[in-house]
Amino acid sequence: MMRGLDTTVRRLRRKVFEEVARLGFKSNPETLNDDMEAIPYKMVNEDTKIKYRESVYRARAIVRERLRLAMGLSLRPENKPVHLTAGVEASNISDKYYEPPLMQVIPSACEACEEKGYEVSNMCKGCLAHPCQEVCPKGAISMVNGKSFIDQEKCIKCGKCKSVCPYDAIAKKERPCQKACGVNAIVSDKYGRAFIDNDKCVSCGMCMVNCPFGAISDKSQIFQLARALSQGEKIIAEIAPAFVGQFGPNITPRNIKAALGELGFSEVYEVALGADIGAIAEAHHYVDKVVTGELPFLLTSCCPSWAVMAKKFFPDVIDEISQELTPMVATARTIKKEHPDAKVVFIGPCASKKLEASRRSVRSDVDFVVTFEEMQAMFDAKGIDLSRYEAESSFHDATGAGRGYGCAGGVAEAIEKCINEYYPDVQVNVEHAEGLAECRKILTLAKAGKLNGCLIEGMGCPGGCIAGAGTNIPVAAAKKSLAKYVQNSSRTIPPKEVAEIELD
C-alpha cells in the first residue's frame, strides 16, 4: 500500500500541482502559454535531483500531460500534433472547469505491466514432492535446471500451483491499477497499456494511487480556484472530517483556518456540520421507510463512488439509495444560505467529489472541489507554513458523530447512535463495506434479499474517506488522528432539531 508514502511519484504529482497553482495565483493571461511551456523544463533538467524517467525527454513529455490534467484539460491525442496549451483559453477562468472524463491514463507514462499470471521465483528449491506439478490441470509446469518452470502458453492462471507451494516460491503477477479497481474498469489498449472503461469507472481514484509509475491522474480545479482567490472574490471553505493530520501531525484546526485565511478564504466550515444534519435525516429516513416496511433496506449515499456504483451495476436498488443531502451539499447550502454572495470550496480526501459537484443538482451549491493533496500544493505555491499561523477561534463546532463520517463504518455508527437516542424503541441492523469489491458483494447480498431491514453503509475507498485518493498521510495515522478528534468533540450526537433546517 503506497498511500501516504512520500514516493517519487507523489513528489512529481505535488510539484505539478504547485506549479499550476502558481500560474493561477499569477493570473496573467498574456504570459500563461509561455509559463506553461517552461514548467516541464523547470521540473526536469540536468540539475533535477529526482529522476522521473530514464530519459529527460520522456519525463518532460509526461510532465506536459500531467500539466494539462492539472489545468483541468484533457490529454492530447497520440496520433496528431496538438500544442501543449491547446484549449487553455477555456480553462483560464475563475470558475469551475471540467472536461470529462475525470480519470485518465497517460499513455506515455504507462509501462504496460503484465496482467494476471504466475511466475516461479528464485525461492524455488526444486523439491522432490513438486506439488505444483501435481496440481496443475494443464501440465504447464516442468522442471528446468532443477527448478519449476511454468509454460505461459499452457498456463490458465488458476493459481493452484501457488496455493500448494511450501516455499511460497510462486509469485502472482497482477497489474497494480487493475488489482486496485473494484469494478473491473481497467482494460488494455491495443499496445497492452492500461485503459479506463468509463462506462464502468466510478472515479474513486484507487487505480491512480496504486500505480507505481504515476501513469494515471485525475483532473484538478486548483488553477481556477487560485485565479478566483487572487481576484479577491468572497470564497468560503468547507473542509471534510478526514482533514485531521493531513497537513502535519501537529497542525490544528486553528492553524488550518488561519492558513486558509492567508490564502484568501473568507471563512471555514466543517463538513461535519452537514454530516450532523445528514445523520439525523438518515435516522428518520430509516425509521420512516425501513422499519415500516416501505423499503427493504436503506443505502447511504455520502460516498459518490459507492452511490454511482450501485446505480451503474445494481439498478434494481436505486430506490433504496438515500435521497438525503450528502454532507458536502448540506454544508454548502448552509453556507450559501448565510452567505449568498460567496463561492464555496469543498476541501477533502476524495477525487469523485469533483464529479458529484458537477451534477446539475449540485453545481450551484459547490463551486470548486480540491483534495487535501491539492490544497497542500496551493499552500506550498504561496510559501505558507501552516505551523506559523493560528486563528483566534476554531471551526464551527460539529459533533463527534458527524466527524466520525471520515472513517469506514462511521456513517452507519452516527446514524445508529441517533436512532438509539431519538427512537429508542427501534432496533437498527447495520452493515457496512469498504472498498468497491466489498461494496459489490454487499449489494449482491442486499439485492438477493439477505439484508432486509438493514442500514447499509458503503465506502468506495478501503478505510473510508481517510484513505481517499487525495489524502496526504498513511491510513493508519489518519485513522488514529481522526479517532482522537472525534473523542475530543464537545458533543457526541447532534440535536434532533437540525433535521428541521430548510436546505432544499
Q: How would you name each of these model-derived features?
A:
Residues 114-117, 130, 159, 205, ...:
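Short flexible coil/turn linkers enriched for glycine and charged/polar residues
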Residues 123, 154-157, 203, 286-287:
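Active-site-facing alpha/beta catalytic cores
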